Amino acid sequence: SQFRTYTPAGLHAYALGTGGSVNAVLEVARNFRLTLTSFYNSGGGRYILGLAPDLTVSTNGSISLVHSMSGIGGFEYQITPASLVYGYYGGVYAMRNYSVVSAGSCLGFGFPGSSSAANRFIQEPIFGYVRTFWKSPSYGALQFITQYSYLVRAPWYVPAGTPENAHTHMVFADLRFVLP
């Protein structure tokens, strides 16, 4: 990713984002797959589902890229041709990046006193079951998907007297028609 800013004085700042990823899906036993994805970057937070910023801009217009990383590890087990169970664990971490404008005033991401929406990390284990009721190579498939997940979120800053993180349990059910 390329980023540019222009200052009132007609100067410009430039930054080039970089990143890397390692991913694998391995069938370690018949019908049992292990999945691994990872992503480390500077300036690529939007590629982590928009959960981290790409950059911060200081008062003089200079650009500073935000470093972030994410990963997912999990398994899928096809019990029968019509039944699949799965479990994944995923996480996102975004490093703070800010500059001090004046005493008690900062600009950027994750500074003391920033919004509690500036997440330091988000973690989520997921477990689910997929039941395929009907499947045809010509017409598609009809599936019922259930999923449970537990989400934990920790911002860089929280006001005094509030919890350091937030967490929730989520349950999903989905009737899905899969196109051929």
Which residue ranges define each predicted feature?
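Short loop/turn motifs that connect adjacent beta-strands in outer-membrane beta-barrel proteins
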Residues: 26-33, 82, 134-144, 180
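Hydrophobic, well-ordered secondary-structure elements that form the walls
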Residues: 36, 75, 127-129, 146, ...
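Detector for outer-membrane/organellar transmembrane beta-barrel domains
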Residues: 1-125
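C-terminal beta-signal and adjacent terminal beta-strands/loops
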Residues: 137-160
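Short regulatory "switch" loops immediately downstream of catalytic or recognition motifs
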Residues: 96-99, 130-134
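Outer-membrane beta-barrel "beta-signal"
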Residues: 129, 165-180
